[in-house]
C-alpha cells in the first residue's frame, strides 16, 4: 500500500520533472484495516494541481465484476476534457443496460463491505496456513499473496505438475533493476476462488513448497 510519504515523494518528483501520475486504484476498496490514501487525496494534501494526477477506478475488483467493463477516470477539469475528447473518437460506447447495472452497483456500498470481509476471511486462513513459513508476510490490501520462494518459475511449474495449482511467477509482474529482479523470488497467488477451494489450494501450496 502506498503511504502518505510515498505519495508525497512521487508528487514532488512529478512537480520537479513535470510529468503526470497515472494511478490504477481499482484495488483501493479491498483493504484489511485502514483505507489507503488515494492519489488525488495525496495531491490535495500536498497542495498539488489535480491536473498532475489521473486516477482510474473500476467495478472489476471492487464489486467482482470484471466482465462488466465499467469504470471511471478522475482528475482535474483539463485532463477530463481531453479524455472525453479521446473517448469521443476512440472509445467504444457502453450499452445502456450495462450503464444501468453499473449505476446501481456503483451506488451500493453494502456489497463492497461484504467483499472486504470475504477477503479478510481468506487472508486469515492464509495467515494460519503459512504461519510457520519464514518471510511470509500478510498484505494490507488487495487479494493476492506474494509467497517467498527460491525461484518463482520453478516453484510455479512444480506446483502445476505436482498439485494442479496454478500461480504466477513474480518475475512476470516485475521489472529488473540494478539490484536484480524484485519479483523473481516470489509467486503470486490470487485468493479469488470460493473459501473451501482457496483453503485447499493454499494447503497444497504449503505442503508442496514449504514442507
Predicted regions and their residues:
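PLP-dependent class I/II
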Residues: 1-211
Amino acid at each position: 500500500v502506498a503511504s502518505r510519504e510515498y505519495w508525497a515523494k512521487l508528487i514532488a518528483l512529478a512537480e520537479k520533472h513535470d510529468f503526470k501520475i497515472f494511478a490504477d486504484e481499482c484495488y483501493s476498496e479491498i483493504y484489511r484495516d485502514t483505507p489507503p490514501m488515494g492519489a488525488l487525496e495525496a495531491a490535495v494534501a500536498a497542495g498539488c494541481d489535480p491536473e498532475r494526477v489521473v486516477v482510474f477506478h473500476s467495478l472489476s475488483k471492487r464489486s467482482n465484476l470484471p466482465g462488466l467493463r465499467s469504470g471511471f477516470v478522475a482528475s482535474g477539469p483539463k485532463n477530463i476534457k481531453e479524455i472525453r475528447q479521446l473517448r469521443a473518437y476512440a472509445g467504444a460506447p457502453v450499452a445502456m443496460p450495462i450503464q444501468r447495472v453499473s449505476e446501481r452497483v456503483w451506488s451500493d456500498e453494502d456489497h463492497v463491505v461484504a467483499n472486504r470481509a470475504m477477503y479478510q476471511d481468506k487472508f486469515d486462513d492464509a495467515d494460519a496456513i503459512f504461519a510457520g513459513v519464514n518471510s511470509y508476510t500478510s498484505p494490507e490490501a488487495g487479494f493476492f499473496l506474494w509467497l517467498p520462494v527460491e525461484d518463482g518459475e520453478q516453484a510455479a511449474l512444480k506446483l502445476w505438475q505436482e498439485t494442479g495449482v496454478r500461480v504466477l511467477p513474480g518475475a512476470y509482474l516485475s521489472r529488473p533493476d540494478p539490484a536484480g529482479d524484485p519479483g523473481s523470488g516470489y509467486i503470486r497467488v490470487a485468493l479469488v476462488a470460493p473459501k473451501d477451494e482457496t483453503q485447499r489450494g493454499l494447503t497444497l501450496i504449503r505442503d508442496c513448497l514449504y514442507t
